[in-house]
Every structure is written in structure tokens, then in C-alpha cells.
């Protein structure tokens, strides 16, 4: 009986690990384990904060549409907006961070996003973390 209980527990633990991404940090000797974030987990955030200026239905500033995975991966007139596994080099993340105003010349000019509610991510850091985790996890569809 103990043997079967052990096997059931082992299978349970193993199946939970499928929802994790393990990424070796190239600069350090540590391993980062992230929950798997998929684009569908970001659609409500983008719809509520970004679509009015960055969608095919609304307006498309700089040719950036955040209304589909394919459009995000295409990027904008300024080039890519996400670089998988590199949130600090991805405009989609960087332009939403509080540090963007201080370091905007490092990547691009312009305003912090969302433009109509620049403090949104200050008040909702878990939403910014979701974008970070999605990019760090490889921008999964």
C-alpha cells in the first residue's frame, strides 16, 4: 500500500511541475523558477489599459497593436516590443516601469505607459509582474 501511495504522490508532484519554467540565469549561478504565463492571461490587462491606443479597433499609435499575440510579436514601427526572456530590454515592460522616466533615453523616448493612467502599475505591481513573468518565461502564446 505504501508503494502505491508513494507512486501517486510522485505523479502528483511531477504533474504540478509542468506549469513551471526553469531558466538558468546566464549572469549568475542561480536558477529562476517561474509559473508558466501565457498571453491569454494578459488579454484583460491589455484590453482595459492599452486597447484605446494600441489596437485594431481603437487606434494604433506607432503601429503597435496589443490585441493579439501575433500583433505583439510583430512589434511596432519602432521595432520589437518584446524580446523573449529579456524583460528589461522589452519596451512593453520597460515603458510601464516607474524607472522608465529616469532611464527613458536608454531605450526610447516617449511617455510612460499607460499614458492616460501612468500610476496604474505603481498601484497594481502584480500586473507589471505578470508582464515581466510572461516575457521572462519566453512570451508563450
Task: Label the predicted regions.
Residues 4-12:
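Sec-dependent N-terminal signal peptides
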Residues 16-141:
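Aromatic- and Gly/Pro-enriched helix-to-coil junctions and flexible linker segments
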Amino acid at each position: 500500500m505504501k508503494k502505491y501511495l508513494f507512486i501517486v504522490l510522485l505523479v502528483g508532484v511531477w504533474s504540478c511541475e509542468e506549469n513551471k519554467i526553469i531558466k538558468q540565469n546566464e549572469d549568475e549561478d542561480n536558477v529562476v523558477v517561474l509559473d508558466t504565463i501565457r498571453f491569454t492571461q494578459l488579454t484583460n490587462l491589455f484590453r482595459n489599459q492599452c486597447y484605446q491606443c494600441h489596437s485594431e479597433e481603437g487606434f494604433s499609435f506607432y503601429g503597435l497593436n496589443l490585441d493579439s499575440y501575433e500583433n505583439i510579436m510583430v512589434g511596432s514601427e519602432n521595432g520589437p516590443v518584446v524580446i523573449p526572456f529579456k524583460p528589461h530590454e522589452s519596451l512593453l515592460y520597460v515603458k510601464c516601469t516607474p524607472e522608465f522616466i529616469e532611464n527613458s533615453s536608454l531605450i526610447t523616448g516617449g511617455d510612460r505607459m499607460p499614458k492616460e493612467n501612468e500610476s496604474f502599475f505603481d498601484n497594481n505591481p502584480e500586473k507589471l509582474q505578470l508582464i515581466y513573468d510572461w516575457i521572462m518565461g519566453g512570451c508563450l502564446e
